[in-house]
């Protein structure tokens, strides 16, 4: 019997493998990314204290997006989370791509965050 491999299960396995070594600190939090077919979410996480320090997504009313599943929306989310992080006093983060390939919407979000002043 031929079965189709589950892409999301593979992504979760890759993410778990990376998360064993990757961790955010209060001085250098983790910029976590989650992508769905319609939206993209980004948040700064302090893993030591288990606290979310800043977040942004395509669902934010501040962005006023009609379509949240494209590269332009991902770049705007990256710029917004970067702006919120810089306003909160963070300039350096650890980028956690969530097991996704660094391509397309993930790369655009990262570029937007870099433009806003984050370093990673």
Curated annotation (Swiss-Prot):
Q: Please, one GO biological process term?
A: translation
Q: How does it assemble?
A: Part of the 50S ribosomal subunit; part of the 5S rRNA/L5/L18/L25 subcomplex. Contacts the 5S and 23S rRNAs.
Q: Which UniProt keywords apply?
A: Ribonucleoprotein, Ribosomal protein, RNA-binding, rRNA-binding
Q: Per the record, GO CC terms? A: cytosolic large ribosomal subunit
Which domain of life, per UniProt? Answer: Bacteria
Give the SUPFAM superfamilies listed for this entry: Translational machinery components (SSF53137)
Start and end residues of each stretch annotated as Disordered: 1-29
Name this polypeptide is given: Large ribosomal subunit protein uL18
Q: Which family does it belong to?
A: Belongs to the universal ribosomal protein uL18 family.
Gene name of the encoded protein: rplR
Among InterPro entries, the record links this protein to: Ribosomal_uL18_bac-type (IPR004389), Ribosomal_uL18_bac/euk (IPR005484)
Give the function comment from the record.
Answer: This is one of the proteins that bind and probably mediate the attachment of the 5S RNA into the large ribosomal subunit, where it forms part of the central protuberance.
Q: Which Pfam families match?
A: Ribosomal_L18p (PF00861)
| Residue stretches of biased makeup (Basic residues) | 9-20
What Gene Ontology terms describe what this protein does at the molecular function level?
5S rRNA binding; structural constituent of ribosome
């Amino acid at each position: 019997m031929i079965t189709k491999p589950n892409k999301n299960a593979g992504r979760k396995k890759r993410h778990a493998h990376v998360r064993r070594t990757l961790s955010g600190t209060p001085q250098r939090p983790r910029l976590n990314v989650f992508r769905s077919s319609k939206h993209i979410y980004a948040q700064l996480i302090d893993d030591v204290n288990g606290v979310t320090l800043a977040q942004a997504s395509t669902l934010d009313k501040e962005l006023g997006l009609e379509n949240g599943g494209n590269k332009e929306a991902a770049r705007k989310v990256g710029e917004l989370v970067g702006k919120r992080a810089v306003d909160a006093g963070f300039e350096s983060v650890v980028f956690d791509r969530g097991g996704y390939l660094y391509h397309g919407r993930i790369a655009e979000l990262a570029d937007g965050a870099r433009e806003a002043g984050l370093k990673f």
